[in-house]
Amino acid sequence: MAVKIRLARGGAKKRPFYRVVVANATAPRDGDFLEKVGTYNPMLAKDSNERVVLKADRVEYWLKSGAKPTDRVARFIEQAGIALPEKVKKEMEVKLKNRKAKPSKKEAKEA
């Protein structure tokens, strides 16, 4: 079973609140999950300590077990000082290079 560490949306309309969960890759975004490993509240100030809260020990356990974090969650994990597996780091670097390499729509029209 492929497992991912991803965000599950909660909160009210126009007031998002996310749980960082470990879930089966094929499960719906807000559906069943295996474990809740943290929270993300985008409504708080960016410098707030409570904006992203992660259970470091459980995140490390799931990463060692082979769970793949989504792009956003991988950034949260790095900011929290938790070591990501080398494979995940390389995938993130490749995605960043691909995003930078694409020309904008204006540049594409001019060429």
Curated annotation (Swiss-Prot):
Keywords assigned: Ribonucleoprotein, Ribosomal protein
GO-annotated molecular function: structural constituent of ribosome
SUPFAM superfamilies to which the protein is assigned, alphabetical: Ribosomal protein S16 (SSF54565)
The keyword Ribonucleoprotein belongs to this UniProt entry's keyword annotation: yes
GO biological process, one term: translation
Pfam family, one: Ribosomal_S16
Any one of the GO CC terms: cytoplasm
PROSITE patterns given in the database record: RIBOSOMAL_S16
Record family assignment: Belongs to the bacterial ribosomal protein bS16 family.
Annotated NCBIfam families: S16 (TIGR00002)
Database matches in PANTHER family: 30S RIBOSOMAL PROTEIN S16, SMALL RIBOSOMAL SUBUNIT PROTEIN BS16M
Record-given protein name: Small ribosomal subunit protein bS16
The gene coding this protein: rpsP
